[in-house]
């Protein structure tokens, strides 16, 4: 759509009909961009451009309220507060789908065999065609359109009667307020779209972060956060929660005989839903027979943790609508569909004890010892409690029934305690995801200390206390001001830290000691062959080859890798020391600024603060590390063992050619990698940022540059290609 010449800057005196045309043009443009962004997942303009047009429409409607239409993008966030949610009786019941109890892929074969049996198909009959789709972990929703306009949105409720949540659903940008006319089927007078309201994982994480910053309760999981938002009485609150929607079916619809669409298959219906502007999951596909259903179950299961949203299984539906009618229903469940779940990712179990683990940096982590429970596809017996403040916040004590979450490779964690009201059924439902669902608050937040305090407990179960001495080495445990975590002060003398410190020192991004893996480090530390980092370079062939499963050839390879690692760089060495808050980028900045290790070791906090991107917390951590005599001794011993690197003069930042300039890199450069370009710019005194702002001096853009380039053009920031950047570096 071409931009209307008067879209943003209207003449001082504009005719009423021109005002209406301008408002219509703005609405049409916003609808088109929203469709591209939310439905097609193919945005064509940066967010800032959308916001600019939105604000222009908003200003126009504010000045001329008579131009506001029900489908205007400005009307999504109404901000009205409802006195209560009104019951809604579904014209077509929102029935549940039978769940296949076999969570293995073979469950698909069971369903296919049942369908073939119900259809009385011969063994040699062609395979049945199905539609396979993800089973979204959200809140079922029914959207009613009359003459193409959204008039009502209702929750599933008990299947017969739900609740009117139209005021909140209108805030979801993926849901069209009006349907486009035209197309193969047109728009029927009555159309009910069934689907799922959900929250993307990234949006959920950002929401919880905002809750924490505001001192509010965090949410248990994306599903409960979405459900809590949908049932808010105040749509302004719902609008602040980033909800999304997928369509997957129809409810009440004008019959074909009265002008409604006459779909032959479920897949045809999904295609039309997309044509009407509804998002349909990209994973949806047709599948012929049991073998393709099994393949779909396995494929989606393997990528489940990489999806941007939660699913708890897949759904199979017979594709032919005629066969669906032939199969019919049994006990209010369709015979033509089944939900094939994956192992649950949240379950309930009992805390049998709380232990404390010590990590590489000395952080003490309380870990709940649990009654074994099968969750996320594995048997879980331990789950992290993070720190003392999380324990107090959640009110966890030994003997409590708790909700445990595990997703993919994420470490299992205790989400919260089971509220007192559910304790009578907790024993019966231990190991159940149903209880985990019920245990969250009505607004989707996690149960915490208040719920735990309400639970009847033995008065003899004390609150957990963090130990004052390290459980591994006996050193004093401290908690720095403003920090939630307790730490052991034993440093490299603590065996728990020693193992992790050795592995960190040896990793590819640090000293790159090939062959020095976890099992070998375990033997070296537990056998007391190594106590400090310099002991690595004192290892001999006899000591190494005498270890379990360490042949002489393998020992020689490790010794050769150790010898090779002696010739390193200052940034790698600094990173390998494992100083808190010092990652690869900070190590490079330190080396570039000071030139040599001695200058870094002797630097004051004030001098460290002069380094690019080093703030008070990082500066204090570096200064504290090198203030410890045993850490300085380790460094000197490593030097004495032959570890060496090339040092240079300290950088005078103010005299560097690009000092004070901020660059942003985007796209693929012809000859330089992103890291190479960054290194060259930083060596010339520039700061390389991750996002474009008014403080950005240059954007360096390569092929397939994204939104950063658009942002630069919008703000008027100069854009360079690789050649331009190199010329700038050479002072041309």
UniProtKB/Swiss-Prot annotation:
Residue stretches spanning the membrane: none
Residues annotated as binding NAD(+): 47-51, 96-97, 133, 156, 196, 317, 341
Residue span(s) of domain BRCT: 653-732
InterPro entries reported for this sequence: BRCT_dom (IPR001357), BRCT_dom_sf (IPR036420), DisA/LigA_HHH (IPR041663), DNA_ligase (IPR001679), DNA_ligase_AS (IPR018239), DNA_ligase_CS (IPR033136), DNAligase_adenylation (IPR013839), DNAligase_N (IPR013840)
Listed Pfam families: BRCT, DNA_ligase_aden, DNA_ligase_OB, DNA_ligase_ZBD, HHH_2, HHH_5, Nlig-Ia
Record: residues binding Zn(2+): 470, 473, 488, 494
UniProt keywords, alphabetically: DNA damage, DNA repair, DNA replication, Ligase, Magnesium, Manganese, Metal-binding, NAD, Zinc
PANTHER family (UniProt xref): CHROMOSOME TRANSMISSION FIDELITY FACTOR 18, DNA LIGASE
Entry's family note: Belongs to the NAD-dependent DNA ligase family. LigA subfamily.
Name the UniProt record assigns to this protein: DNA ligase
Organism of this sequence: Paracidovorax citrulli (strain AAC00-1) (Acidovorax citrulli)
């Amino acid at each position: 759509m071409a931009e209307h010449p008067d879209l943003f800057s209207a003449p001082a005196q504009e005719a009423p009909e021109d005002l209406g045309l301008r408002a219509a043009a703005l609405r049409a443009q916003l609808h088109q961009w929203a469709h591209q962004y939310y439905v097609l997942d193919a945005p064509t303009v940066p967010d800032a451009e959308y916001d600019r047009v939105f604000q222009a429409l908003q200003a126009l409607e504010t000045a001329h309220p008579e131009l506001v239409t029900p489908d205007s993008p400005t009307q999504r966030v109404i901000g009205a507060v409802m006195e209560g949610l009104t019951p809604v009786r579904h014209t077509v019941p929102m029935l549940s789908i039978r769940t296949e109890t076999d969570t293995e892929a073979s469950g698909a074969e069971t369903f296919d065999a049942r369908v073939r049996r119900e259809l009385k198909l011969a063994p040699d009959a062609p395979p049945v065609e199905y539609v396979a789709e993800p089973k979204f972990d959200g809140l079922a929703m029914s959207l009613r359109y009359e003459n193409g306009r959204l008039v009502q949105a209702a929750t599933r409720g008990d299947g017969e009667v739900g609740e009117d949540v139209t005021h909140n659903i209108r805030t979801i940008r993926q849901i069209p307020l009006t349907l486009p006319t035209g197309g193969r089927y047109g728009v029927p007078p009555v159309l009910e779209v069934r689907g799922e309201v959900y929250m993307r994982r990234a949006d959920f994480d950002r929401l919880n972060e905002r809750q924490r910053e505001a001192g509010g309760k965090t949410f248990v999981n994306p599903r409960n956060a979405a459900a809590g938002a949908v049932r808010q009485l105040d749509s302004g609150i719902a609008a602040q929660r980033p909800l999304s929607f997928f369509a997957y079916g129809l409810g009440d619809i004008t019959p074909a005989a009265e002008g409604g669409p006459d779909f032959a298959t479920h897949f045809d219906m999904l295609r039309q839903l997309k044509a009407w502007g509804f998002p349909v999951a990209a994973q949806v596909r047709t599948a012929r027979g049991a073998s393709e259903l099994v393949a779909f179950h396995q494929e989606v299961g393997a990528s489940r943790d990489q999806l941007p949203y939660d699913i708890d299984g897949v759904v199979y539906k017979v594709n032919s609508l005629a066969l669906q009618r032939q199969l019919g229903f049994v006990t209010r469940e369709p015979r033509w569909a089944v939900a094939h779940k994956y192992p649950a990712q949240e379950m309930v179990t009992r805390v049998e004890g709380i232990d404390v683990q010590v990590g590489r940096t000395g952080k003490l982590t309380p870990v709940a010892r649990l009654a074994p429970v099968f969750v996320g596809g594995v048997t879980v017996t331990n789950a992290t409690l993070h720190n003392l403040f999380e324990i107090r916040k959640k009110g966890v004590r030994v003997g409590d029934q708790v909700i445990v979450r595990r997703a993919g490779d994420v470490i299992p964690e205790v989400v919260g305690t089971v509220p007192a009201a559910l304790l009578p059924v907790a024993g019966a439902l231990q190991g159940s995801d149903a209880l985990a669902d019920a245990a969250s608050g009505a607004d989707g937040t996690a149960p915490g200390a208040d719920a735990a305090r309400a639970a009847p407990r033995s008065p003899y179960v004390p609150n957990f206390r963090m130990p004052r001495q390290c459980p591994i080495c006996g050193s004093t445990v401290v908690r720095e001001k403003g920090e939630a975590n307790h730490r052991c002060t034993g440093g490299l003398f603590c065996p728990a830290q020693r193992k992790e410190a050795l592995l960190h020192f040896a990793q590819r991004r640090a000293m790159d000691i090939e062959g020095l893996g976890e099992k070998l480090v375990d033997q070296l530390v537990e056998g007391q062959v190594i106590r400090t980092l310099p002991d690595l370079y004192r290892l001999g062939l006899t000591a190494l080859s005498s270890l379990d499963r360490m042949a002489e050839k393998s020992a020689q390879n490790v010794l050769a890798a150790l010898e090779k690692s002696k010739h390193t760089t200052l940034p790698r060495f600094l990173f390998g020391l494992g100083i808190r808050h010092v990652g690869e980028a900070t190590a490079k900045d330190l080396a570039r600024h000071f030139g040599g290790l001695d200058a870094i070791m002797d630097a004051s906090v004030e001098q460290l603060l002069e380094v690019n991107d080093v703030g008070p917390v990082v500066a204090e951590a570096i200064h504290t590390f090198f203030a410890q005599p045993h850490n300085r001794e380790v460094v000197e011993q490593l030097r004495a063992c032959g570890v060496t690197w090339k040092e240079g003069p300290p950088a005078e930042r103010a005299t560097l050619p690009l000092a004070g300039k901020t660059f942003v890199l985007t796209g693929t450069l012809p000859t330089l990698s992103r890291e190479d370009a960054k290194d060259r710019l930083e060596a010339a005194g520039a700061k390389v940022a991750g996002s474009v702002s008014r403080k950005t001096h240059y954007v360096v853009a390569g092929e397939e540059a994204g939104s950063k380039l658009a942002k630069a053009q919008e703000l008027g920031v100069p854009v360079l290609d690789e050649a331009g950047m190199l010329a700038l570096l050479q002072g041309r």
